[in-house]
């Protein structure tokens, strides 16, 4: 679903790809076609996951308007750490040598060099640090897992367990190698004298909570899966710095078009971040809206301080990814509890906070075409155990956990 949001600029329940296995809609002009119509050469390398043609080759009509193609629909099933199989414009299999992210970086640099004389829009979709599905592992390049074994563990993962101890070293190793590869891409742009006229955007479609929040590793409302890195380099973003405004993946498509001087269509749901960098334009929203799927049908809003989430009960009628009723499931005070260890949703003293956040959520739901009932939390909360005060204290926290007395 996140991939469809990026290619259309619309929330998943509007563009229709609200879960895996639903192809990218053809009723919305995709991002690549906006760039193509503006005179850009468009290319895609890596994982697509927006077609129904199986794991490998993707038919031309299902490629979202990209002209040049070297990709697989579900890359984790056509490759592993030292074997990378992608498919070209003719749907012929192409094997790339080296560690997987290195092989894709090499392909990206070749593409940049081949098209350096014309404006281009290249979308590279790495799979690292996604886990390797069929072996339930995070295969770092040789030596990298060992380098990052027994390193720092985020407090939420340390408290909640999951598969963290088994997988975190490999995950860190994959992140490190990918970071080195991105450095090679920026070096290539500099050597080709393209760095001052090229914008590089780095982001992820989701994070990873290592099975601490539910039986999976990414499908939840928690920061470890919901919050992702987002960095811009070059052009109006060359000055450096960090901004703290709340933004969403839905803001990236209008930003890319805006920076390229291409009109942003009204059909896109996000806002260009260029105004934030240039400190112009209207006030920025004080919250972001998000949707969760597959492990649950959920909706939520996040402000600077609060996280509020609802999900459809198991017996709800879910049609086209939407429910007629949701139950309040999580409320977190991110200021007092940044690692989301104390769920406040059922505590009466936070009723006013819930009410205000519920109002924001209902406005967002109306925008995407939902008018559900939001019910109070059920008597028993599932999906996350309560963490004892002693466990939190052992992690080095000295503050009281909100909503609990000692």
Where are these regions (language model features)?
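Formylglycine-dependent sulfatase
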Residues: 1-330, 338-359, 363-366, 372-373, ...
């Amino acid at each position: 679903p996140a991939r469809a949001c990026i290619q259309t600029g619309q929330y998943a329940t509007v563009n229709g790809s609200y879960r895996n296995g639903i192809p990218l809609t053809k009723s919305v002009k995709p991002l690549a076609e906006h760039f193509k119509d503006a005179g850009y050469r468009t290319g895609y390398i890596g994982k697509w996951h927006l077609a129904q043609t199986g794991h490998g080759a993707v038919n031309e009509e299902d490629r979202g308007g990209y002209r040049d193609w070297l990709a697989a629909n579900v890359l984790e099933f056509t490759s592993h750490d030292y074997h990378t199989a992608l498919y070209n414009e003719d749907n012929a299999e192409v094997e790339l040598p080296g560690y997987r992210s290195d092989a894709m970086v090499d392909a990206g640099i070749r593409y940049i060099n081949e098209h350096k004389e014309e404006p281009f829009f290249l979308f590279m979709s790495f799979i690292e640090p996604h886990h390797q599905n069929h072996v339930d592992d995070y295969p770092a390049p040789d030596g990298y897992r060992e380098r990052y074994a027994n390193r720092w563990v985020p407090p939420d993962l340390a408290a909640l367990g999951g598969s963290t101890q088994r997988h975190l070293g490999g995950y860190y190793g994959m992140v490190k190698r990918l970071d080195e590869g991105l450095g090679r891409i920026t070096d290539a742009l500099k050597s080709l004298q393209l760095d001052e006229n090229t914008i590089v955007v780095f982001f992820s479609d989701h994070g990873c909570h290592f099975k601490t929040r539910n039986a999976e590793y990414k499908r939840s409302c928690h920061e470890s899966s919901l919050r992702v890195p987002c960095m811009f380099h070059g052009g109006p973003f060359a000055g450096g710095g960090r901004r703290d405004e709340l933004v969403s993946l839905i803001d990236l498509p209008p930003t890319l078009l805006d920076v390229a001087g291409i009109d942003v269509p009204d059909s896109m749901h996000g806002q260009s971040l260029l105004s934030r960098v240039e400190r112009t334009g209207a006030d920025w929203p004080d919250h972001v809206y998000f949707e969760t799927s597959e492990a649950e049908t959920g909706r939520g809003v996040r402000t600077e301080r609060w996280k509020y989430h609802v999900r459809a009960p198991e017996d709800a009628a879910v049609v086209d990814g939407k429910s007629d009723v949701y139950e309040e499931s999580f409320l977190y005070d991110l200021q007092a509890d940044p690692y989301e260890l104390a769920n406040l949703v059922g505590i009466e003293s936070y009723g006013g906070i819930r009410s205000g956040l519920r109002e924001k959520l209902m406005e967002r739901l109306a925008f995407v075409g939902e008018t559900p009932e939001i019910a109070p939390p059920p008597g028993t909360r599932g999906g996350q155990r309560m963490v004892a005060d002693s466990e939190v204290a052992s992690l080095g926290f000295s503050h009281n956990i909100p909503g609990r007395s000692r």
